[in-house]
């Protein structure tokens, strides 16, 4: 106010996906949560649920997500595939974009040039393919810095890690299937 006092006080929580809720909304969401078939609050509990029910982590997470969302497992897989597509698109944009990042610090994008160097080396000598995930992560982080569309998983600051591993898996593993991609993301979601 005019005397320098508080006008209003409110607690907000970041609940992921770029969304925030008030403390009242957060409490209401907790009350409205649907029961899940494989509840857990720690990694040890998740692993125990998987052992007890003879499930992979991705299977337990898939069943829980379907229960929470009130939809089929096929619908959850469709949504997870959509997340994978957003991650792939982010890497492709990051590898194609050139120039300076916004913000006035005159920081140039490096991912496209590093990718070009790796491609050139590949034709002339053995390349350590483990360098590719670093380039993919950098492409995502540069897209993030440029205000591009990223998936904030596990956090916005680490948004390049999961897409980089996913893209590397798809590109370099001959056994990569859509189901394995989805299982990877479901498992990564459980780990957070």
Regions found by a protein language model. Name each.
Residues 1-121:
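C-terminal regulatory domains involved in ligand/effector binding and gene-expression control
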């Amino acid at each position: 106010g005019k005397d320098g006092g508080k006008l209003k006080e409110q607690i907000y929580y970041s609940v992921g996906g770029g969304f925030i809720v008030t403390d009242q909304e957060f409490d209401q969401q907790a009350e409205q949560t649907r029961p899940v078939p494989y509840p857990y609050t720690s990694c040890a509990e998740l692993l125990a649920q998987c052992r007890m029910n003879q499930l992979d982590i991705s299977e337990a997470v898939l069943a829980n997500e379907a229960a929470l969302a009130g939809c089929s497992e096929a619908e959850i897989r469709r949504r997870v595939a959509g997340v994978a597509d957003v991650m792939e698109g982010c890497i492709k944009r990051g590898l194609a974009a050139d120039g300076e990042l916004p913000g006035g610090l005159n920081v140039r994008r490096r991912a496209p040039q590093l990718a070009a160097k790796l491609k050139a080396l590949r034709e002339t000598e053995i390349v350590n393919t483990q360098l590719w995930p670093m380039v993919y992560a950098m492409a995502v982080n540069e897209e993030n810095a440029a205000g591009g569309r990223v998936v904030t998983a596990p956090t916005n600051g680490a948004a390049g890690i999961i897409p980089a591993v996913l893209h590397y898996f798809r590109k370099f593993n001959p056994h990569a299937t859509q189901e394995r991609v989805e299982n990877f993301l479901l498992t990564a979601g459980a780990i957070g």
